Amino acid sequence: MGSFSIWHWLIVLVIVMLVFGTKKLRNIGQDLGGAVKGFKDGMKSAEDPNEQIPQSTTTAEKTVDVQAKDINK
């Protein structure tokens, strides 16, 4: 009862193919592959220290002084 044999997995695969169809399964596989590739590319760029986002050194030229007033008079 612990492990399924190859025949169990083949029957499950046939049932899934009948329910979803091969075109739908292919689209799901492509979407999943694209997501994994995007994740790997993101992790690769995060590990590369040469490609860090430069820090902005500009300061605000204008400051706004706001005086709070009591609305409830």
Swiss-Prot record:
Gene Ontology MF annotations: protein transmembrane transporter activity
Region (Disordered): 44-73
Annotated Polar residues bias: 52-61
Superkingdom classification of source: Bacteria
Record key words, sorted: Cell inner membrane, Cell membrane, Membrane, Protein transport, Translocation, Transmembrane, Transmembrane helix, Transport
Keyword Membrane: yes
Segments of skewed composition (Basic and acidic residues): 62-73
One of the GO biological process terms: protein transport by the Tat complex
Protein topology in the membrane: Single-pass membrane protein
Residues that span the membrane, as ranges: 1-21
InterPro entries in UniProt: TatA/B/E (IPR003369), TatA/E (IPR006312)
Location(s) in or outside the cell: Cell inner membrane
Self-association state and partner proteins as the record states: The Tat system comprises two distinct complexes: a TatABC complex, containing multiple copies of TatA, TatB and TatC subunits, and a separate TatA complex, containing only TatA subunits. Substrates initially bind to the TatABC complex, which probably triggers association of the separate TatA complex to form the active translocon.
NCBIfam families with a match to the protein in the record: PRK02958.1 (NF002813), tatAE (TIGR01411)
Family classification: Belongs to the TatA/E family.
Known role: Part of the twin-arginine translocation (Tat) system that transports large folded proteins containing a characteristic twin-arginine motif in their signal peptide across membranes. TatA could form the protein-conducting channel of the Tat system.
Protein known as: Sec-independent protein translocase protein TatA
Organism: Polynucleobacter asymbioticus (strain DSM 18221 / CIP 109841 / QLW-P1DMWA-1) (Polynucleobacter necessarius subsp. asymbioticus)
Taxonomic lineage: Bacteria, Pseudomonadati, Pseudomonadota, Betaproteobacteria, Burkholderiales
Gene: tatA
